[in-house]
Amino acid sequence: GSVVTLGRGGSDYTATILGAYLSAEKVTLYKEVDGLLTADPKYVPNAQMIPELSYQEAAELSFFGAKILHPRSIIPLIKPKIPLFLKNTFYPEEPGTKISHEVSKSRLPVRALTAITGQSLISVEGCGMMGVPGVAMRTFKAMGEDAISVSLISQASSEASICFTILESDRERALHGLKTEFEFELKNGLIERIQGLEKVAIVAVVGMGMKGRKGLSAQVFGAFRQADLNVIAIAQGSSEFNISMVIDEPKVPLAVQTLHHEFFGSQTPNEVQLVLNGFGQIAQALTQQL
C-alpha cells in the first residue's frame, strides 16, 4: 500500500503499461526532440533522424545511452506488438520515430551509434582461473550482493581473465567486494590481480542489418585504426546486432564521429555560404585561395 515513484522514465513506462493493458493500436510519447537520431547531436551535430526501429534496436540504444527513452518502457509493448511513436511536443505533425515489431529492411546495416560515459572497467585476472568452474558466477554474485549493475562483460577464451564495466561511482565498492570474495585465491596466487580502470566509456554500434554481415567488424576496427583509436575491450552478443567497445572516455567524441562518418557519410556540409563585408587585401587574398 506504499506510494512510490518510478524514477527516470516512469511516465513513459506508465503510458506503455496502460497501452498494453488497453490493447491500444499505438502509443505515442511526446518529447522535446523529433525522435531518435543516428548519434548523439552533442558529438555529431547533424546526426540523422531514424524513421523506424525494431523493439530490440530501440532497447539496445536506450540501454547504451539514448536518454530519450528508457529501455524498460518498451517491454510492455513487445508481446502485444503495439507500435510506439516518439514525437516532438512542439512539432507533433512531424513523423518522428516509429518503434515496432515489423520494420522495413534498411539499406544500411547500422541503425545508430550510442555511448555510455562515466564507466570503470573491472578486471579479474589469473592463470589459476583457467578451467575452474564458478569463477564468473562468484564474480557477478559479488556484484549482485552489492546491488552493482554490470553494463558489459568480456571474457578471454582461455578463462584467464574476465572484465566488465560498471558505473565509475561503484568502482571502490566493486573492488572491495571482489577482493573479499576471492581472498583465498589472491593470497595463494590463483588470482594475480583485481583492478579497476577509471575514466572509460562504451561505444556501441547497433543495427538489425548487422546480423550475418561479413566484414562489418573489420569496417568498425578499420575506421578506429585510421583515427588512431585504441579499443580496450570488446563484446558482441550472438544476436549480432550490437558491437560494443570500451575506450578511453576522452576519445568518445572522436570515436562516435569516426563511426558515423564510416556508416552514414560525412558530417561536413558540401556547401558553405560566405559573405565578405568589403574587399580589402585580406578578402582579396582569401578569394584567391578559394
Give the location of each predicted region.
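Glycine-rich adenosine-cofactor-binding loop
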Residues: 272-290
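C-terminal catalytic "cap/lid" subdomain
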Residues: 1-270
